[in-house]
């Protein structure tokens, strides 16, 4: 049980720190825009590897390029995280595209369209 709590806290902390780096423009890459959001972080059982699922809250934003840029900057991101957290080793990050936000925006548009046609 302790490992699950530790894993959950670590996942939350990593997500928050990556989000802070993106919003504060700590990563100086023009492909990484402030509309990016960390959807979730999943650690491996041994806490050595972490998948970071990234989404965009802006429709039409190029998520593929942003994920490539984040993977290129993962060494820098890991070094920034290790400055803020006290663990023996920082996990190896892998940034992955997550389309769930854009799909939910699409479903919302459909529902809004149905509501407006129903009102007319």
Swiss-Prot record:
GO terms, molecular function: ribosomal small subunit binding
Keyword terms: Cytoplasm, Ribosome biogenesis
Superkingdom of this protein's organism: Bacteria
GO biological process terms on file: maturation of SSU-rRNA
InterPro entries documented for this protein: KH_dom-like_a/b (IPR015946), RbfA (IPR000238), RbfA_dom_sf (IPR023799), Ribosome-bd_factorA_CS (IPR020053)
PROSITE patterns given in the database record: RBFA
GO cellular component: cytosol
Subcellular location: Cytoplasm
A Pfam entry, by short name: RBFA
UniProt xrefs under HAMAP family: RbfA
UniProt cross-references to PANTHER family, sorted A to Z: RIBOSOME-BINDING FACTOR A, CHLOROPLASTIC-RELATED
Family: Belongs to the RbfA family.
Subunit annotation: Monomer. Binds 30S ribosomal subunits, but not 50S ribosomal subunits or 70S ribosomes.
Task performed by this protein: One of several proteins that assist in the late maturation steps of the functional core of the 30S ribosomal subunit. Associates with free 30S ribosomal subunits (but not with 30S subunits that are part of 70S ribosomes or polysomes). Required for efficient processing of 16S rRNA. May interact with the 5'-terminal helix region of 16S rRNA.
NCBIfam families hit by this protein: rbfA (TIGR00082)
Protein name, as recorded: Ribosome-binding factor A
Gene name as annotated: rbfA
């Amino acid at each position: 049980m302790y490992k699950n709590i530790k894993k959950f806290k670590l996942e939350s902390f990593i997500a928050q720190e990556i989000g802070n780096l993106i919003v504060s423009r700590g990563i100086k890459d023009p492909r990484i825009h402030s509309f990016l959001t960390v959807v979730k972080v999943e650690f491996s059982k041994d806490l050595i590897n972490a998948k970071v699922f990234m989404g965009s809250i802006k429709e039409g934003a190029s998520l593929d390029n942003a994920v490539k840029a984040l993977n290129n900057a993962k060494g820098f991101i890991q070094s920034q995280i290790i400055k803020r957290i006290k663990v023996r080793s920082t996990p190896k990050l892998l940034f992955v595209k997550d389309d769930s936000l854009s799909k939910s925006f699409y479903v919302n548009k459909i529902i809004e369209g149905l509501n407006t046609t129903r009102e007319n």
